[in-house]
UniProtKB/Swiss-Prot annotation:
Belongs to the radical SAM superfamily. Biotin synthase family. The lineage of its organism: Bacteria, Pseudomonadati, Verrucomicrobiota, Verrucomicrobiia, Verrucomicrobiales. Disulfide bonds: none annotated. Residues 44-273 form the Radical SAM core domain. The gene is bioB. Its EC number is 2.8.1.6. [2Fe-2S] cluster binds at S106, C138, C198, R268. One of its GO terms (molecular function) is 4 iron, 4 sulfur cluster binding. It comes from Akkermansia muciniphila (strain ATCC BAA-835 / DSM 22959 / JCM 33894 / BCRC 81048 / CCUG 64013 / CIP 107961 / Muc). The keyword S-adenosyl-L-methionine applies. This is Biotin synthase. It catalyses: (4R,5S)-dethiobiotin + (sulfur carrier)-SH + 2 reduced [2Fe-2S]-[ferredoxin] + 2 S-adenosyl-L-methionine = (sulfur carrier)-H + biotin + 2 5'-deoxyadenosine + 2 L-methionine + 2 oxidized [2Fe-2S]-[ferredoxin]. InterPro entries: Aldolase_TIM, BATS_dom, Biotin_synth/BioAB, Biotin_synthase, Elp3/MiaA/NifB-like_rSAM, rSAM.
Length: 321
């Protein structure tokens, strides 16, 4: 029996894989690995697929120096800069996605963390959306206190998003203005406040396969059931502008491994999907069962209409409101 088959049987039986086993699994034949990851997805999650959307609620002028990010004030990029959008603009985005059956809508803001005034304004916006629209609300506002998490939850937010981005080992190579532990603390506070959490990373930041496994194992250890997988889109003007994007085989291998790490949740494909020739079709048969649809924060995405058509062809049942 191959290593892939052996670990598949264990996971289907409710077991888990060690770090060393996952590293070895990452070197197994790709087709068998992807088929096994898809079998795990079917066993634990069926054909349910989760689509969400995001809106860039405040853009640019971020104090942080994340080397991949177009919104960092440390780099000269062509990103549009604007302050926090109005209640009506944020509501319009929610209504647009709600009308298309999208289950979740997230407001994302640039910046290291929110001020008390920012939180008050955003909570008013979340309440305004909740009063006029039935879409589920997510929030992504950087590092955040437990008190602010509690305020967001009271305003109608059900899930907080905060990516670890990369492994503890690689993090200082990517960002020096905040730490891996800062992000872990934010996640823990969100969980303590009663919010669900969505957390993953960006692939293609110079990390190793071991780094990827370490990061997703850290996330899984927190009980998180929504794990985004982003693929770097190099942005002109950033230090990572000349990074070589990952190839299809490596992308598929990563997604399959995440499914082995988290058998029963949503492996969510996010940034970088628009650069794939098939817009993620192979990945959605290799363990992934969720995606961000529409545009990303500063890059183009795949339209909701295209996603719904493709997922129907693949036999998925998209979670709708």
């Amino acid at each position: 029996m191959s290593l892939t088959s052996s670990l598949l049987s264990r996971v289907l039986g409710g077991g888990s894989c060690s770090r060393e086993e996952l590293i070895a699994l990452s070197r197994e034949p790709l087709e068998e690995l992807c088929q096994a990851a898809n079998a795990i997805r079917e066993h634990f999650c069926g054909n349910v697929f989760d689509l969400c959307t995001i809106i860039n609620g405040r853009s640019g002028k971020c104090s942080e120096n994340c080397k991949y990010c177009a919104q960092s004030a440390h780099y000269s990029t062509a990103v549009e800069e604007y302050p926090l959008l109005s209640d009506e603009a944020l509501l319009a985005g929610a209504r647009y996605n709600d009308a298309r059956g999208i289950l979740r809508y997230s407001i994302v803001t640039s910046g290291k963390r929110l001020t008390d005034e920012d939180v008050d304004r955003l909570c008013a916006s979340y309440r305004h959306i909740a009063e006029h629209c039935g879409i589920s609300l997510c929030a992504s506002h950087g590092l955040i206190s437990k008190k602010h998490c509690e305020q967001l939850k009271a305003a109608g937010v059900s899930r907080y998003h905060n990516n670890l981005e990369t492994s503890r080992r690689n993090f200082p190579n990517v960002c020096t203005t905040h730490t891996y532990d800062d992000k872990l603390q934010t996640i823990k506070w969100a969980l303590e406040a009663g919010l669900e959490v969505c957390s993953g990373g960006i692939m293609g930041l110079g990390e190793t396969m071991e780094d990827r496994i370490d990061m997703y194992m850290d996330i899984a250890a927190l009980g998180i059931k929504s794990m985004p997988v982003n693929f770097l889109t190099p942005i002109p003007g950033t230090p990572y502008a000349d990074m070589t994007p990952l190839g299809e085989e490596e992308q598929l291998r990563i997604v399959a491994l995440v499914r082995f790490i988290m058998p029963d949740g949503f492996v969510r494909i996010a940034a970088g999907r628009n650069t794939m020739k098939d817009h993620g079709r192979k990945i959605f048969m290799s363990g992934a069962n969720a995606a961000i649809s529409g545009d990303m924060l500063t890059t183009a995405g795949v339209t909701i209409r295209e996603d719904l058509a493709m997922l129907a062809e693949l036999g998925y049942e998209v979670r709708m409101k």
